[in-house]
């Protein structure tokens, strides 16, 4: 069995796609940061290793993060270059602008789905979160055909609600669903 993906074409069920977050998540480690040239060299090394998807950064986080994602999108060939964004329209637009020049691009958008996060972090009701899922994926699709959606704090989410969120993301056009075991 296989399926068709906008950035990978027809994919066999046994194909493992390597998704690397070093440039985004690795930068959150205390005492570890890279300048622009180091980030580009790291992205080029990941491409040389055969990494399929590089999450290059969180473009809305800072002008420096935007610039590094943009430069990686312009220079690194081969892997899908991804910009991370919350479900906020400004985040998604900024990510879309940052990855514009990539030969293969993706926006990875997320929102918290657990009762705890919805109540205290987002201050949203579940139906509002579902609306954000749909709207965020729909907006991201205006910048790229390849959109990844993630449920932040998904492991503490009611399974029925999580399935509704996944269904909403797929219906809105998400091509990759990410259900992590840890927080983003």
Segments and roles (model prediction):
Residues 2-10, 91-102, 167:
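Short amphipathic alpha-helices and their capping/turn segments at secondary-structure boundaries
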Residues 65-73, 92-98, 157-169:
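Distinct, well-ordered alpha-helical segments
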Residues 1-89:
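N-terminal capping/small domains of soluble enzymes
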Residues 79-147, 155-161:
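Active-site beta->alpha loop and helix N-cap motifs at the rims of alpha/beta catalytic domains
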Residues 182-184:
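Conserved small/polar residues in nucleotide/adenosyl-binding loops
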Residues 26, 46, 107, 149, ...:
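Conserved, mostly hydrophobic/aromatic
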């Amino acid at each position: 069995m296989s399926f068709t993906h906008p950035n990978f074409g027809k994919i066999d069920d046994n194909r493992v796609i390597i998704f690397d977050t070093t440039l985004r998540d690795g930068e959150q480690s205390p005492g570890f940061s890279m300048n622009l040239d180091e980030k580009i060299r790291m992205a080029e090394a990941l491409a040389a290793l055969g990494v399929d998807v590089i999450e290059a950064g969180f473009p809305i986080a800072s002008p420096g993060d935007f610039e590094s994602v943009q430069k990686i999108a312009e220079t690194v060939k081969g892997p899908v270059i991804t910009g991370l964004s919350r479900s906020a329209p400004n985040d998604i637009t900024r990510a879309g602008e940052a990855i514009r020049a990539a030969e293969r691009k993706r926006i990875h958008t997320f929102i918290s789905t657990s009762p705890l996060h919805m109540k205290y972090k987002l201050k949203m009701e579940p139906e509002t979160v579902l609306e954000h899922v749909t709207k965020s994926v729909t907006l991201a699709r205006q910048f790229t055909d390849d959109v990844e959606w993630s449920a932040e704090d998904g492991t503490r989410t009611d399974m029925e609600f999580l399935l509704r969120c996944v269904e909403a993301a797929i219906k809105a056009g998400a091509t990759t669903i990410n259900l992590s075991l840890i927080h983003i």
